[in-house]
Amino acid sequence: MCLYVNKEHPYTQASGPWPACLPRRWQLYKDQRRLHRPGGRRPMSTSDSHLGSPRKRQLQRAAPAAPQHSEYQQQLSTLGMRIRQAVDNGYRAPQDPVRAAVPHAVPAAACVQDNTLYTVPDYKRVPLAADRAPPMLVNQRTVSSTSSLQAWESQLDERLSLIDSSIMHNKLGAGEFMLGGTKRAFDQLETDNW
């Protein structure tokens, strides 16, 4: 049992041997007093003194190397390098027109892959029943209740020609240019009462 009697020094023991907890408590007391002072810092313990910070110890541990799980991982890791090497070797091939004209023989061990089972057949539209109308080109919630592609295209042509003509007439001088007028000279500004 610890018995403290000195009020100036709260960790002074009155009698008996020093308990094992006292040096650590005294260190914590001093650390708290330092932290509450302006500019106070926590002192490094002896275990942290070679690192500078307890967090740095975690950073200095080496990450364990990932084991190679199979022989294919090594081959995959060098795949890009092997592709670049093959392309480079292809560019270095001799540009002999006689060799290029001779077809290369296919080796006997070559494998031809048959993908006919996975080929998608030609799509044919199923004709609509006579009692059904084709779907509308616009949303059902719009005002239009009927729709025709030809009517929409003719309205589009009208709108585009209207937009083109309004752009040409709104440009500076474009209306006069279309009507055959010319730009005014600087001397004509006085005659126009500018």
From Swiss-Prot:
Is the keyword Metal-binding assigned to this protein? Answer: no
Kindly state which keywords UniProt assigns to this record, in alphabetical order. Answer: Cytoplasm, Nucleus
Q: Which domain of life is it from?
A: Eukaryota
What are the record's GO terms for cellular component? cytoplasm; nucleus
Subcellular location as annotated: Cytoplasm; Nucleus
- A GO MF term: ribonucleoside-diphosphate reductase inhibitor activity
Q: Does the keyword 4Fe-4S apply?
A: no
A Gene Ontology annotation in the biological process aspect, one of them, is: protein localization
Specify where it is mainly localized.
Answer: cytoplasm
Disordered: where is this region?
Answer: 34-74
Give the family this protein belongs to, as stated in its UniProt record: Belongs to the DIF1/spd1 family.
Relate the protein's function as given in its record: Mediates the nuclear localization of the ribonucleotide reductase.
> PANTHER family from the entry?
DAMAGE-REGULATED IMPORT FACILITATOR 1 (PTHR28081:SF1), DAMAGE-REGULATED IMPORT FACILITATOR 1-RELATED (PTHR28081)
Query: What is the protein name stated in its UniProt record?
Result: Damage-regulated import facilitator 1
Organism field: Eremothecium gossypii (strain ATCC 10895 / CBS 109.51 / FGSC 9923 / NRRL Y-1056)
As recorded in Swiss-Prot or TrEMBL, the protein's gene is named DIF1
